[in-house]
Amino acid sequence: MNKMKLTALLLAAAMGCGVFTACGSKKDKKSSSASSEASSDKEAETESFDTESYNNIIMNDIEKAESSDEAPSLGSLGDVVTPDEDDDEADLGEYRISDTGVKLYFDNTAFPEGLMLTLEKYFNSFATADYTTYSSCVYPDYLEKMEAYLQKEHNYDMKTSFAAQCTNLANNMNGKFKLTRIKMDVPERYDESKDNLTAYFENFTDILGEDYYKNLTKEVDKVYDGEFYVMAEGHNGTENLLISAYEIVFVKKDGRYYVFG
């Protein structure tokens, strides 16, 4: 990939938030009987991506999926790779490659290997529409409270929300995609009057309740704040930025890493 293009993709922040957080309404979905007979691969490779058909197809499997509180199988990371100075990717810095071939860019003094492998597993669940894996990566209390909130306030569930997020990401790639790179940075302070984590959990007060962050710090071993970028390859082999400069929070509890999101 062209060096200038790659750098520009990773610095572009316009594509991240809206694509990743949108949710759909279960009552708005149409019957999937006709769509379920079609191949999801065929749908994904059309020039004009059919979001409704894709959502219906994956929702059939997601509705059957079970939530899991078992730790996901994370695999391992290879040795640190330092690109040559004249390499097109040198500006991205050092990386390590996971068992699935994803390049992970991170400072291991800020973000442990297990956290990064959990992040990879988490985002790969959106690429494969695997709700069981998704649920195994998310902090259980968050999942439970978000489920209750969606049911009460919006009349749909986490599976519907998950399917909508999978569909939005696939739509951004014009079809099915696979992860190629994940970059995690320590974010700058967003608000001088408070730290990032305090501000982050204040945004979820209506869902998680008052003093949630304060109580959370007593229940877990550590809370991590990160800013990440995700690149992916579409069915045509082109690598594109999928998510840019998006905040994410992890916790470590009993040796295991969980995502809030």
Where are each of the predicted segments found?
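Bacterial N-terminal signal peptides that target proteins for export
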Residues: 1-9
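Hydrophobic alpha-helical targeting segments used for export or membrane insertion
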Residues: 9-15
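C-terminal motif of bacterial Sec signal peptides marking the signal peptidase cleavage site
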Residues: 18-22
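Bacterial signal peptide processing site
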Residues: 24-27
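Exposed beta-sheet edge and beta->alpha loop/turn motif
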Residues: 34-35, 47, 52-57, 181-261
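Short, low-complexity N-terminal intrinsically disordered segments enriched in polar/charged residues
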Residues: 50-124, 128, 144, 152
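Short solvent-exposed beta->alpha transition segments
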Residues: 77, 82-88, 93-105, 135-216
